């Protein structure tokens, strides 16, 4: 029953795409149709989700045979388990709010209908990825979110930065896709199937190679350390794109892939250790990078990358349900933070530099209140949405001594989260206004207010509802020292205090020269400088030298002109060194003749 209802809610999403074939696509009401369709799909999806939670079933798989290729049977297969049943309503709710926000933010764009079509396709491909039960179907969704992110990041294609950012996103994801395809090939070769339940049932040995491929895929898609530079660059797209990309679609796809494969990962300690280290490095590195950024959207982008690192850490300590809880809770406040920043940017005539803001608390009370609550939820203040997942992750990491290194990095990153959140509030909302006095600020638009209001309610209450319905629903009694329970809160408060102390110090003490730590953070750990400059420079110089050696030096000089000139020179030297003494020549003839006659007579 509820599998049919869930599939109906997913099919409803395709209606606007079908209608866009006809003239309604040209109609100005098309964006409103898309927004309403998503809201209906969300309400419809709530019914099967509630039924699923209360029925206590584990998984429902709907199978339609598609094709058979020799021994491989491909089917259109939907897997409706806890992960997909909870994620679909969350993604639909967040996207509904983002669509409504887009009606206000993109109202003057001449191609708004195409923009909404792209956003809807983006959502549909994510739904395909989440509900897929075989690797081929999952790959379709995986590539779908990749190409849609490329189109949406480069929406304002007249700007060079937007084009570069879109190319960067697609190229970094290509590196990840190599890992995915390698894993697909390995599973096909060793298990002769792409269906997830069959792979888990066969439980192949020596899964290091495919899981390494899947980890590489997740690193590319979820912007983990090494393949992370595309995420802050993606801020060149419109704010609704940033909100959708960073909350419930693209970036969580990599984490979701690892969650799907947790039955294989939990038995492989090598991959788990690697995942734990990768997540810990990412969460700390990106938190450090966020500290000195001045673009409001880039700070929030780096915070996304930091939270994704936290999710990867959670998978590394073998807690997939906890990582999934953090995906769901993170979607609400992260989308709201982007929408609040979009509201500020739009009101200040596209100004993104937080140093040119200030005093917005009086001018935009609703937006600033939402921004503060979103920042508090991000830092994990008790009883807001972020607390229910973030606090649990740190508590769970505390249960084993082997996690000590990763736990320390996670705690430092959690503290730094409070620092950069305070920095946004301090620079953008408090103090004296630093923008032009003639700027007209107006946030009284129902599309803007309603969309942020819904996510604000979600940022306060969603964590409580989702965490109460996460497995296991009957929680075993746990004993934990009070100091351990309060660790996460303590480091957050420490971060707030540190940020305020530093802000007060900087007013009194001005550094003459920026320190190396500041430079490291501001230049993003020198990573883009090294990786985006040195390899192209090395390739360019190497290709230039090889081209000049092969074409100019060898072919044009050494083989034809130089070889001929060398031959002529040696010949002329040989000829010119002859003395012209005819007696010697005759004598040499005579010696030769005498020797030949002697040899002839000797033979006889």
Swiss-Prot record:
The EC number(s) this enzyme carries: 7.1.1.2
GO biological process, one term: mitochondrial electron transport, NADH to ubiquinone
Keywords linked to the UniProt accession: Electron transport, Membrane, Mitochondrion, Mitochondrion inner membrane, NAD, Respiratory chain, Translocase, Transmembrane, Transmembrane helix, Transport, Ubiquinone
Record GO terms (molecular function): NADH dehydrogenase (ubiquinone) activity
Main localization category: mitochondrion
Subcellular location(s) per record: Mitochondrion inner membrane
Coiled coil regions in record: none
Gene Ontology cellular-component terms listed: mitochondrial inner membrane; respiratory chain complex I
Record membrane topology: Multi-pass membrane protein
Enzyme class: translocase
Reactions performed catalytically: a ubiquinone + NADH + 5 H(+)(in) = a ubiquinol + NAD(+) + 4 H(+)(out)
Cross-referenced InterPro entries: NADH_DH_su5_C, NADHpl_OxRdtase_5_subgr, ND/Mrp_TM, NU5C-like, Proton_antipo_N
Transmembrane segments: 2-22, 41-61, 85-105, 115-135, 138-158, 169-189, 209-231, 239-259, 271-291, 299-318, 323-345, 364-384, 411-431, 455-475, 486-506, 582-602
Assembly mode: Core subunit of respiratory chain NADH dehydrogenase (Complex I) which is composed of 45 different subunits.
Function of the molecule: Core subunit of the mitochondrial membrane respiratory chain NADH dehydrogenase (Complex I) which catalyzes electron transfer from NADH through the respiratory chain, using ubiquinone as an electron acceptor. Essential for the catalytic activity and assembly of complex I.
Family: Belongs to the complex I subunit 5 family.
Protein name: NADH-ubiquinone oxidoreductase chain 5
């Amino acid at each position: 029953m509820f599998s049919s209802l869930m599939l109906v809610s997913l099919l409803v999403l395709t209606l606007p795409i079908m209608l866009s074939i006809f003239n309604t696509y040209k109609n100005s009401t098309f964006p409103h149709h898309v927004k309403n369709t998503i809201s209906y799909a969300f309400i419809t999806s709530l019914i099967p989700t509630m039924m699923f939670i209360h029925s206590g079933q584990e998984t429902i798989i709907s199978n339609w045979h598609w094709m058979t290729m020799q021994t491989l049977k491909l089917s259109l297969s939907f897997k409706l388990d806890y992960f997909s049943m909870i994620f679909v309503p969350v993604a639909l709710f967040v996207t509904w709010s983002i669509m409504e926000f887009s009606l206000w933010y993109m109202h003057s764009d001449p191609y708004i209908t195409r923009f909404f079509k792209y956003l809807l396709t983006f959502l549909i491909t994510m739904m395909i990825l989440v509900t897929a039960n075989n690797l081929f179907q999952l790959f379709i969704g995986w590539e779908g979110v990749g190409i849609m992110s490329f189109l949406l990041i480069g929406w304002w294609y007249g700007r060079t930065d937007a084009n570069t950012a879109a190319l960067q996103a697609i190229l970094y994801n290509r590196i990840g896709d190599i890992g995915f395809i390698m894993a697909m090939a390995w599973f096909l070769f060793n298990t002769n199937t792409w269906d997830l339940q069959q792979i888990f049932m066969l439980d192949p040995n020596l899964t290091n190679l495919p899981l390494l491929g899947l980890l590489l895929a997740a690193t590319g898609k979820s912007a983990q350390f090494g393949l992370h530079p595309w995420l802050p660059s993606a801020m060149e797209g419109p704010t609704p794109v940033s909100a959708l990309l960073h909350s419930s679609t693209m970036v969580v796809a990599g984490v979701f892939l690892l969650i799907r494969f947790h039955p294989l990962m939990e038995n492989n300690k090598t991959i788990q250790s690697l995942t734990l280290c990768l997540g810990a490095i990412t969460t700390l590195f990106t938190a450090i990078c966020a500290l000195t950024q001045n673009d409001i959207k880039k700070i929030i982008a780096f915070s996304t990358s930091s939270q994704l690192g936290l999710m990867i850490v959670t998978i590394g300590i073998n807690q997939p349900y906890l990582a999934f809880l953090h995906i769901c809770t993170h979607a609400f406040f992260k989308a709201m933070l982007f929408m609040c920043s979009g509201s500020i940017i739009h009101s200040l005539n596209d100004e993104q530099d937080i140093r040119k803001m200030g005093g917005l608390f009086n001018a935009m009370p609703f937006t600033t209140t939402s921004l503060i609550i979103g920042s508090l939820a991000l830092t994990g203040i008790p009883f807001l949405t972020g607390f229910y997942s973030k606090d649990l992750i740190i508590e769970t990491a505390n249960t084993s001594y082997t996690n000590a290194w990763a736990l320390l990095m996670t705690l430092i990153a959690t503290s730094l989260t409070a620092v950069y959140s305070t920095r946004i509030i301090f620079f953008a909302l408090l103090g004296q206004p630093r923008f032009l006095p003639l700027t007209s600020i107006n946030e009284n638009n129902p599309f803007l207010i309603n969309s942020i209001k819904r996510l604000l309610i979600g940022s306060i209450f969603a964590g409580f509802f989702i965490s109460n319905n996460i497995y296991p629903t009957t929680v075993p009694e746990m004993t934990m020292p009070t100091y351990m329970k309060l660790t996460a809160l303590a480091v957050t408060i420490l971060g707030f205090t540190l940020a305020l102390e530093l802000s007060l110090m900087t007013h009194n003490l001005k550094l003459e020269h920026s320190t190396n730590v500041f430079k490291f953070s501001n230049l993003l750990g020198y990573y883009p400088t090294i990786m985006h400059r040195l390899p192209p420079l090395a390739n360019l110089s190497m290709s230039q030298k090889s081209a000049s050696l092969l074409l100019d030096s060898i072919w044009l000089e050494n083989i034809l002109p130089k070889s001929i000139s060398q031959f002529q020179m040696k010949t002329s030297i040989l000829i010119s060194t002859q003395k012209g003494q005819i007696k010697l020549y005759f004598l040499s003839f005579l010696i030769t003749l005498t020797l030949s006659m002697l040899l002839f007579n000797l033979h006889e």
